[in-house]
Amino acid sequence: MYLIFDTETTGLPRDFKAPITDTDNWPRCVQIAWQLHDGMGNLIESKDYLIQPEGYDIPYEAEKIHGISTDLAMEQGIPLKDMLIEFKEVLGRAKFIVGQNLKFDTNVMGCEFVREEVENDLQEMPVLDTCTEDTAALCQIPGGRGGKFKLPTLTELHQYLFNQPFGSAHNATADVEATTRCFLELIRLRNYSSIQLEQSEKYFTEFTQTNTSSIESIGLTHLNLKAESKKIR
């Protein structure tokens, strides 16, 4: 099964190469969303949590991006450890973790596991990323390093695959839904190899027979977190 997830955080690390044990370096997770799908793309589980800030405030610069204020996270969030235990459980049901530029999210979550001393297999999970040289070659957007095509943003990839904009970035639920749609469409278009997916050629035939046309969104309702934060001020 495929576990697609995304986080919103308090900001960026000082050093992107720092280990996840460097708890002073990595930002805090203030929202996580995930979807678990079976091999044919069927939705098994969808979850979304705000995380109560414990011992820190969400910087206003971060709030301006994702809309999650400290007050909103305290009022509507759950304790970090509760989320980590549930996330660990769903990790155990997945074969792959999937995301857009996923290394950042795995490091953020890995560091949160370290902080709470929760054992987990996140760093050992096989990764399928939607932001790669393969998707860069697919979208063919100029401006990459060394004359290469640039790595596509989620918005750019979504626009290329479905010829429609995606304007809800920086809400983890919306980002996960868009990433999931792109990921499953990339399977349908055979942008991933049988080796990458650890499948036989028969898998792609079954997948395209199950998904005969472009992948559709599952139609989740995404809260306007900026509006929610304003309500409680």
Where are these regions (language model features)?
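Metal-dependent phosphoesterase signature
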Residues: 63-86
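Short acidic, Gly/Ser-rich segments with clustered Asp/Glu that frequently serve as metal-coordination loops
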Residues: 7-15, 20
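Metal-dependent phosphoesterase core characteristic of DEDDh/y 3'-5' exonuclease domains
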Residues: 15, 26-68, 88-232
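Acidic-residue sensor for enzyme active/binding pockets
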Residues: 8, 23, 112
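Short consensus segments that form the blades of beta-propeller domains
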Residues: 20-26
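Extreme N-terminal starter segment of soluble prokaryotic enzymes
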Residues: 1-3
